[in-house]
């Protein structure tokens, strides 16, 4: 039985939770206790959705500006992009349009995108008093439509909320995209 490999790349501002999301998902829901900054990392995770096995090759990228020359090196052959912002960091949300979509259009136009709002557990946190600047779900949904994302979802790595659903959607979208684009492969002889 052939196992399909899906290349997933995560991008977004520094500190939005890319590494934590991937570590939690690939470690069976175990939230990491220490923060480890990432320049570039690759997680491999086997998933079974609707009886079909897939090997997820998930690339974690650094969000800092000083890595803008490194990120494009991993874009070739990407099947789907996870574009992350943190709901408590409005600047990371605004950077989706001002920074990230520009980079995507330059290096991998037409790639399927899932827009992901992270850290939704903070909406219910008693530790944060002023939540007036938090990004609301409807704002994320509107932005996903504006940028032409295939899907929008929110999740919490700390509470392991929405991660399984996110990666089920990744597999479904890549399967649909491959079925619709079987004849669009470029072959150079």
From Swiss-Prot:
GO cellular component annotations of the record: cell projection; cytoplasmic vesicle; cytoskeleton; plasma membrane
Pfam families assigned: Ras
Residue span of motif Effector region: 35-43
Record lipid sites (S-geranylgeranyl cysteine): 186
Entry keyword annotation includes Protease: no
Record SMART domains: RAB (SM00175), RAS (SM00173), RHO (SM00174)
GO terms for MF: GTP binding; GTPase activity; protein kinase binding
Entry superkingdom: Eukaryota
Keyword Electron transport: no
InterPro entries membership: P-loop_NTPase, Small_GTP-bd, Small_GTPase, Small_GTPase_Rho
Listed transmembrane segments: none
Compartments, as annotated in UniProt: Cell membrane
Cysteine methyl ester: modified positions: 186
Primary localization: membrane
Propiece residue ranges: 187-189
Positions annotated to bind GTP: 12-19, 60-64, 118-121
Membrane topology: Lipid-anchor
UniProt-listed SUPFAM superfamilies: P-loop containing nucleoside triphosphate hydrolases
Similarity-based family: Belongs to the small GTPase superfamily. Rho family.
PANTHER family given in the database record: RHO FAMILY GTPASE
Protein name per the record: Rho-related protein racM
């Amino acid at each position: 039985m052939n196992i399909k490999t899906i290349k997933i790349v995560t991008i977004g501002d520094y500190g939005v939770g890319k590494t934590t999301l991937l570590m939690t998902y690939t470690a069976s829901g175990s939230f990491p206790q220490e923060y480890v900054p990432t320049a570039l990392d690759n997680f491999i995770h086997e998933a079974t959705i609707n009886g079909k096995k897939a090997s997820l090759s998930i690339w974690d990228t650094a969000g800092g500006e000083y890595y803008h020359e490194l990120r494009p090196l991993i874009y070739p052959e990407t099947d789907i992009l996870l574009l992350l912002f943190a709901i408590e960091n409005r600047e990371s949300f605004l950077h989706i349009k001002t920074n990230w979509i520009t980079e995507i259009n330059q290096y991998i136009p037409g790639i399927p995108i899932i827009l992901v709002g992270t850290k939704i557990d903070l909406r219910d946190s008693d530790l944060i008093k002023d939540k007036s600047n938090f990004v609301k779900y409807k704002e994320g949904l509107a932005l996903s439509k504006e940028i032409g994302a295939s899907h929008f979802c929110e999740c919490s790595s700390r509470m392991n909320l929405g991660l399984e659903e996110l990666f089920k959607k990744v597999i479904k979208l890549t399967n649909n995209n491959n079925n619709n684009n079987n004849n669009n492969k470029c072959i150079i002889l």
